[in-house]
C-alpha cells in the first residue's frame, strides 16, 4: 500500500484519533481493500491505520499460490470502528479467509502496546476518498449493519449453497417424482426442473428485509387491487411498519447496504434486492406526501449511487429495457407533481434534469405504467 499526500495536521489527528485494523498472516499477493480503495498485499502488510471512526467495508480475494493469476471470489465484512479503536484479526490459511472471531483482550492490549513498532507495516487509510465513501453509506447505522449482515459476518460474492433435498440415488429422484437423469431432456424447462433446488447454507445469507409479493391487502376488491398495483404505497407502508417501526428512514440504510454489497462485494443478490427495494420506493405515489423527508434523502442517495455505475448497466440484455429509466420515470411523474411538497418537487426536478443531461435518459415519454394494467385476481374474487 503506497502512502498518500495528506495534510500534516490531519495526518497527526488521524494518527492519534483514528482506528486501526490489524490483519495478521494475510498472504502476499492477496487483493485487499477497504471502502473505496484496494491493493495487492505485499510481504510486510499487517493492516490499516488512521481509519476515520464509523462504518467501513473491508474485502479481499485470495490468490492461488501455484498460479497467482487465479483469484478467488471476493469476500468482505463490515466493521463499525470507534475512535482510537483497535481490531485484531488473522488469516485462516485452511479456510483461506479472514477469521472474524474476536481476539482475546490480552492479545489486543499487547498489540496496542506494540503499535509503535508495528506502525511501519500498517498502510494509512486513503483519506482522499472518504467523502465519497460517506456519501454512499451515511444512512447505514451500526444497528442496520448488525441487522443485515450474515450471522457469519462474511459476505461472499458467491453464495455457499446446499441442496434442499439430498438425492444421492436414482430411487430418491423417483420418490420425488423427478425425471431420471439418464433420460434426454425434452425442453429447457425440463432441464431446469432436473437441477437440484438449492438454499444458502445457514448463517451465510445477507438478512435483507422480506419484501411483499402481494401489493394489496387481503380481501381487496378488484378496484382496490388495481389501485394498489399501480401505487405501491400500501406495500411500502407494510414494509416500513414491520421492518422499520422506529424510524422509516432506516429503509435508506438498507438500500445503501445492498448497493455497497453489490458494488464492492460483487454480490448479485444484493443488486437484485436493491432493484426491488428501489422499485417499491419509486412507485409509491401516496407515500411521497407522508414521507417527503425520506424521499428528499432518497434523491441524494441515488445521485451518488448512479455516479458509480455506467449508464448502460441497467439495460436488460434481452429486452433492451432500462430498469432504472422506467422506474425513475414513474417516480418523477409523481415527485414532480404540483401536489407534492415544494422542496421535494424542486429537488426531483433538478435530479431529473441532471440525469437527462448526464445520461441522455428520456423521462418525457408516457410511462408504460400509465397503460391499462392487467392484474391477476386472487382465487375467489370475481369482477362485477
From Swiss-Prot:
InterPro entries cross-referenced by the UniProt entry: AAR2 (IPR007946), AAR2_C (IPR033648), AAR2_C_sf (IPR038514), Aar2_N (IPR033647), AAR2_N_sf (IPR038516)
Keywords, ordered alphabetically: mRNA processing, mRNA splicing, Spliceosome
GO cellular component: spliceosomal complex
Alphabetical GO biological process terms: mRNA processing; RNA splicing
Stated family: Belongs to the AAR2 family.
Assembly description: Interacts with PRPF8 (via RNase H homology domain). Component of a U5 snRNP complex that contains PRPF8.
General function of this protein: Component of the U5 snRNP complex that is required for spliceosome assembly and for pre-mRNA splicing.
Protein name: Protein AAR2 homolog
Phylogenetic lineage: Eukaryota, Metazoa, Chordata, Craniata, Vertebrata
Gene symbol of the encoding locus: Aar2
Amino acid at each position: 500500500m503506497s502512502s498518500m499526500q495528506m495534510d500534516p495536521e490531519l495526518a497527526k489527528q488521524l494518527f492519534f484519533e483514528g482506528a486501526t485494523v490489524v490483519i495478521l498472516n494475510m498472504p502476499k499477493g492477496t487483493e485487499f481493500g477497504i471502502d473505496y480503495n484496494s491493493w495487492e498485499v505485499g510481504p510486510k502488510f499487517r493492516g490499516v491505520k488512521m481509519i476515520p471512526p464509523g462504518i467501513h467495508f473491508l474485502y479481499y480475494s485470495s490468490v492461488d499460490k501455484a498460479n497467482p493469476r487465479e483469484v478467488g471470489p471476493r469476500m468482505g465484512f463490515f466493521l463499525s470502528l470507534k475512535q482510537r479503536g483497535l481490531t485484531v484479526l488473522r488469516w485462516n490459511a485452511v479456510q483461506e479467509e479472514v477469521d472474524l472471531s474476536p481476539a482475546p483482550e490480552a492479545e489486543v492490549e499487547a498489540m496496542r502496546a506494540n503499535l509503535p513498532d508495528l506502525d511501519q507495516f500498517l498502510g494509512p487509510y486513503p483519506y482522499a476518498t472518504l467523502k465519497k465513501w460517506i456519501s454512499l453509506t451515511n444512512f447505514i447505522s451500526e444497528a442496520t449493519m448488525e441487522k443485515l449482515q450474515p450471522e457469519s459476518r462474511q459476505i461472499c460474492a458467491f453464495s455457499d449453497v446446499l441442496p434442499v433435498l439430498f438425492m444421492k440415488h436414482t430411487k430418491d429422484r423417483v420418490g420425488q417424482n423427478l425425471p431420471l437423469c439418464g433420460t434426454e431432456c425434452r425442453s429447457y424447462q425440463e432441464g431446469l426442473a432436473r437441477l437440484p433446488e438449492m438454499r444458502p447454507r445457514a448463517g451465510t445469507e445477507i438478512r435483507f428485509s422480506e419484501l411483499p409479493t402481494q401489493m394489496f391487502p387481503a380481501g381487496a376488491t378488484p378496484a382496490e387491487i388495481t389501485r394498489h398495483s399501480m401505487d405501491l404505497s400500501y406495500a411500502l407502508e407494510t414494509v416500513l411498519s414491520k421492518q422499520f417501526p422506529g424510524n422509516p428512514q432506516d429503509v435508506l440504510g438498507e438500500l445503501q447496504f445492498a448497493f455497497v454489497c453489490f458494488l464492492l462485494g460483487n454480490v448479485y443478490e444484493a443488486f437484485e434486492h436493491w432493484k426491488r427495494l428501489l422499485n417499491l420506493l419509486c412507485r409509491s405515489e401516496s407515500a411521497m406526501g407522508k414521507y417527503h423527508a425520506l424521499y428528499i434523502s432518497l434523491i441524494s442517495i441515488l445521485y451518488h449511487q448512479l455516479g458509480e455505475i455506467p449508464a448502460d448497466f441497467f439495460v436488460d440484455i434481452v429486452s433492451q429495457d432500462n430498469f432504472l429509466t422506467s422506474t425513475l420515470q414513474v417516480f418523477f411523474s409523481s415527485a414532480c407533481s404540483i401536489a407534492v411538497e415544494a422542496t421535494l418537487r424542486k429537488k426531483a426536478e433538478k435530479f431529473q434534469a441532471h440525469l437527462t443531461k448526464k445520461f441522455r435518459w428520456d423521462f418525457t415519454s408516457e410511462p408504460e405504467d400509465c397503460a391499462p394494467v392487467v392484474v391477476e385476481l386472487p382465487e375467489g374474487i370475481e369482477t362485477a
